[in-house]
């Protein structure tokens, strides 16, 4: 496969940004989105449950934002939103995305914070979570129920030996529930583990 990036989930999705094609492994080989997105620039892909959500812009008119949903078989997408936006799309190819099936939403990162997307609406134009000054978001994930958002942060100029922090938010309200400071060097993945 000729791909530029992979979306890290239980079932990975691989993206070729130049051709606007993405792939998903299957028992018989690899599923492909074929030419279904050829008219769009893909900026973000997020798997939530058995669905794959795509955030893109229309190549001919980049102010038009295209939001769609498909399955891992990558069949014909369902268009969720296709609209002319007064502001440019905030998500970029370096954005981290995490989705919740139970809350029908996605969170994604940008330079100025973390944004919330209610899957039934257009994208938000302002962040719902601000990042503390001097911190960089290094990880974004959710617990298995999709009710808690885990944000891994790195404080590059911090004075402690361990510069990594974990902030936990309520997915429905974007409210900070708890925070753990100086728990790792640089959090790259936060995984929820059930206690036995």
Range-by-range predicted roles:
Residues 18-24, 60-70, 111-118, 157-168:
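Structural motif
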Residues 161-196:
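Blade-level signature of beta-propeller repeat domains, shared across WD40, Kelch, NHL, RCC1
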Residues 1, 28-37, 75-88, 123-132, ...:
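A short beta-strand motif characteristic of beta-propeller blades
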Residues 12-13, 52, 106, 149:
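Hydrophobic beta-strand positions that form the internal "hydrophobic ladder"
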Residues 1-30:
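Long, acidic/polar, low-complexity amphipathic helices and coiled-coil-like
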Residues 78-162:
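Intrinsically disordered, low-complexity segments enriched in Gly and acidic/Ser/Thr residues
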Residues 14-17, 55-58, 110, 151-155:
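Recurrent small/Gly-Pro-centered beta-turn motifs in extracellular repeat architectures
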